[in-house]
């Protein structure tokens, strides 16, 4: 029983170490993939940045008001 508990504790510690370093490892792998393909191969697919633009023009406000009538 003591041996099983010791093996369980060692396994838990090793799994925690793996989970904590996994982000760093996967991040480095992704940087390597991005460097292989370059900027042209991998474009920024996050198109939500434009939807959070805080500067609304008068035309934008007018369009929004017409949409929500």
Swiss-Prot record:
This is Amphipathic peptide Hp1404. It comes from the Eukaryota. One of its GO terms (cellular component) is membrane. The lineage of its organism: Eukaryota, Metazoa, Ecdysozoa, Arthropoda, Chelicerata. The modification Phenylalanine amide is found at residue 37. Amphipathic and cationic peptide with an alpha-helical structure. Expressed by the venom gland. The keyword NADP does not apply. Antibacterial activity is decreased by serum. Its main location: secreted. It is found in: Secreted; Target cell membrane. Belongs to the non-disulfide-bridged peptide (NDBP) superfamily. Short antimicrobial peptide (group 4) family. Residues 41-69 form a propeptide. One of its GO terms (biological process) is defense response to bacterium. Keywords: Amidation, Antibiotic, Antimicrobial, Cleavage on pair of basic residues, Cytolysis, Membrane, Secreted, Signal, Target cell membrane, Target membrane. Residues 1-23 form the signal peptide. Antimicrobial peptide that acts by inducing concentration-dependent membrane disruption, implying a membrane-lytic mode of action. Acts with potent activity against Gram-positive bacteria (MIC=4.04-16.16 uM) including methicillin-resistant S.aureus (MRSA). Its activity on Gram-negative bacteria is controversial.
């Amino acid at each position: 029983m003591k041996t099983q508990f010791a093996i369980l504790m060692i396994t838990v510690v090793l799994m925690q170490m793996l989970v904590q370093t996994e982000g760093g490892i996967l991040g480095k792998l992704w940087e390597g993939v991005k460097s292989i393909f370059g900027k042209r191969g991998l474009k920024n697919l996050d198109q939500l940045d434009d939807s959070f633009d805080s500067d609304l023009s008068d035309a934008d406000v007018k369009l929004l008001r017409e949409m929500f009538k």
